[in-house]
Amino acid sequence: MSKTIELAKHLEKLHINNMYKSDFYWTWDKTDEELEAIFTVADALRDLRERNKSTRIFDSGLGISIFRDNSTRTRFSFASACNLLGLEVQDLDEKKSQIAHGETVRETANMVSFMADVIGIRDDMFIGEGHKYQKTFMDALDEGYRDGILEQRPTLVNLQCDVDHPTQCMADMLHMIHQFGGVENLKGKKIAMTWAYSPSYGKPLSVPQGAIGLMTRFGMDVVLAHPEGYDVMPEVEEIAKKNAAATGGSYKKVATMEEAFDGADIVYPKSWAPFAAMEERTKLYAKGDQAGIDALEKKLLAQNAEHKDWACTEEMMKLTRDGKALYMH
């Protein structure tokens, strides 16, 4: 029996009926069995690919991508995933569409969705705006489908919003499952989700938030470390605490990278912008103050530069379990 057939039989045992016609906004919206189903399907697709078997389930159709922030890895991952399943990819560049002339989200959403099976959206730079935009877009499609404008309603995959980055975090999680020989072996493992200096730009909060929101669901000991002022959304921290309590793991915050790395099985250094600055950026965005946003960006880079000692070095890695922690980014 092939691995794919074994995985398919396992899939039949899971309670996943509610996934049909659902969207993927945040990992904490999904049940444990729904997350398990996603991992199972991913492993089946991987097995088929490795054995040079076709993974096409569509003869035609579109995967629409909308990147309202720059992307390399996620852009190519989404395009590769669509191609793997038999979908053509069409990327909507808002600056080259009628959106630039004032067309509404409601109009655009229905127009681009006529032949679409899936829509991936990234909107991550402004606190309180990214998830809202994705919801507004999909609410317009609900209306279009209800009114007979669309013959089918495509599903949404969040390619990173202001709250979560579920595709990256799920891929990270599956990698850890493989590295440690099964999801059951992750229980009790310490993962350090730490801020790290970057000279580039004020990055979104959604990666650290997605990590603590997902990895606490598997009984792991999750430690978040960052300089003062670089907090994440308190509501996501509450989710992490509840997850840890429910699964026998733990969640805590520390003030130094050294404490987070001490005895860690996995380390995840990643830069993100200060929470207060992200809120200020959103206010400037609402005013259409691009000059203010540019000035804030310079301020953020200067603030980041005050914490250049927050870096993953060989000496820092020696603090981890046997000096051999799994490094992720």
What are these regions (language model features)?
Residues 57-63, 187-189, 324:
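Phosphate-coordination loops involved in phosphoryl transfer and adenosine-cofactor binding
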Residues 68-80, 177-291:
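Glycine-rich phosphate/diphosphate-binding loop of Rossmann-like nucleotide-binding domains
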Residues 2-76, 80:
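Positively charged, low-complexity intrinsically disordered leader regions
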Residues 56-177:
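Phosphate/diphosphate ligand-binding glycine-rich loop within oxidoreductases
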Residues 103-107, 205-210, 284, 309-312:
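Charged helix-capping and loop-helix junction motifs
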Residues 147-154, 220, 319-328:
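A short helix->loop->beta-strand "cap" motif at the edges of active sites that frequently abuts
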